Structures are given as C-alpha cells and as structure tokens.
C-alpha cells in the first residue's frame, strides 16, 4: 500500500515505451516520486528494462 503523500510531492509510475512496440510479453514499470511544482510536465527517464536487457526510455503514465 502506498502511503498518503502531502504537499507537492506525488508518486508516479514510469512505463517502458520500447517494450510495448516490441510485442514481447510482460511489462517494465518503475515507481518514483516527483515534485509537482518543479516538474509540471510528464517525466521521461532512461531506465533498465530487465526483459529487453538494456536501457530504454520510460515515460510517466496517468
């Protein structure tokens, strides 16, 4: 269970974009936090995808 976060810091889920296009089964997701005031746009980070075994672009999902 996620704890209730007060203030501008929110928990976001990052999902791999390249994995969806590859058609392989499974999904790569990371959970992180971001400051809503400093980062108003959706977060995009390069993270390791264990299924594809390489660094891929992960985007914030709603």
Swiss-Prot record:
Record's Gene Ontology CC terms? cytoplasm; ribonucleoprotein complex; ribosome
Q: Which Pfam families match?
A: Ribosomal_L33
Which InterPro entries does the record associate with it? Ribosomal_bL33, Ribosomal_bL33_sf, Ribosomal_zn-bd
Q: Which residues are listed as membrane-spanning?
A: none
Could you tell me which Gene3D superfamilies the record lists for this protein?
Ribosomal protein L33
GO MF, one term, reads: structural constituent of ribosome
UniProt keyword list = Ribonucleoprotein, Ribosomal protein
One Gene Ontology term from the biological process aspect of the record: translation
Family as reported in the entry's similarity comment: Belongs to the bacterial ribosomal protein bL33 family.
Q: Which HAMAP family match?
A: Ribosomal_bL33
Task: Supply the name of the protein.
Answer: Large ribosomal subunit protein bL33
